[in-house]
Amino acid sequence: MKYLRICYLVILSFLISSSILAEDTKVSNDNTKFNIYSGMFDFSDNGKRSTLIGFQHQNTDLNRDTFLGNLSPITGFMFTADSAAYLYTGVQAQYSIGALNIIPSFTPGLYNKGDGKDLGHLLEFKSEVQISLNLFQNTQLGLSYNHLSNASLGDKNPGANSYMFNFLKTF
């Protein structure tokens, strides 16, 4: 029941952010991008590192041009081998230099430690940078690094650093 409530909250926040961003839309034929990734959760903590796998969705029809560049809403989730889970929604930008893409993102989300690392709070913030290479017109391969933190909302804030290998496909 707890997970169902968390899912409803994330979907609701995605719908709210989507309606806000829908005012300034950029229409394209390829409007859905999926990112499937796998890597090492909390690689800098020898005691709590764990394998992770995740999925992220981006709808490029909801892009918005801002002073930071072109921003797009993203929603996703990741699980670790220790049964920890993180469900998130936020924004990302994309800056291209030829076939190379630099993609920073920020996503608040809900974290459940499972048998994994206790990050100190249910609400965690993920800041990430991804570097990807265009393999084909609609396919990218990349490497990303992120940091999860509760911004000192909890009594403790150990944070977690992770790296992932990304496969991105646009439909």
Cite the ranges covered by each PLM segment:
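Cleavable N-terminal export/targeting peptides
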Residues: M1-D30
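Transmembrane beta-strand segments that form the barrel wall of outer-membrane beta-barrel proteins
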Residues: K33-D42, L68-T80, I103-L110, S144-S149
